[in-house]
Amino acid sequence: SAGGGLQMMVTGVVQNMTGESAQRAALGAGAIVIDVLAANDGRLPHEKIERIRTMRPDMILMAGGTDGGAVNHVVEMAEYVAAAEPRPRFGVTYKLPLIYAGNKEAQPQVKKILGEKSALVVTENIRPVLERENLAPARNKIHDLFLEHVMQQAPGYKKLMEMAGAPIMPTPAAVGLIMEAIAKREHLNLIGVDI
C-alpha cells in the first residue's frame, strides 16, 4: 500500500458500541486502525489529546450517539480532537481529513468545533439506533477522502493518474467489486479474507 496503508484513528462514545462500529467501518474500508478513543476508555482528557497529537493519523473517523440521543459526549470528543490539532503523516500543508458519522443532532456543534481545523465531511450515523449499524456511508467516505486527500500526497500519484485509463480506486474497493462481479457471474455467495 502507498505510504504504508491508510492509518486511521477512530472515536466513539461507548468503546464497545460506537467505538467498535467506527473500527469496523474503518477496517472494512481497508484502513489500519491505530487507536480507538472513546468517552469511556479510561483515559483522562489530557491523555486523549496527547494520543491524538502523537499518533499523526492519515484520517480520523468520529462516531458516537444514536440519532436523537444526547450530544454532550460526542461534542466532548470533538473538543478533544480540536484541542489536539492533529497533523497528518504526509502533506503537512493540508488539513487532516475527518469524517463525522455520529448523532445527527450533534452535527452543528461538531461543524462549529472542527469545521475550520480539519477537512470535515459529515455522513450518515454509523449507529442511528442501538440495534443497527450503518457502515457503508462512512466506508464510502473513507475511500473518497483517501483518494482526494491522502493519495494526493503520495509520491508518484499524480503521474499514475495521468497514465491510468480509468478512475483509480482504493485496493479494498477494487477487491470488493471484483468479488461482487464473480459472485454475480457464478451465482455464488462469497466471503473474502484480506491477510
Task: Give short role names for the model-derived ranges.
Residues 1-189:
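Nucleotide/phosphate-binding catalytic cleft detector across ATP-hydrolyzing
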Residues 190-194:
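Short glycine-aspartate micro-motif
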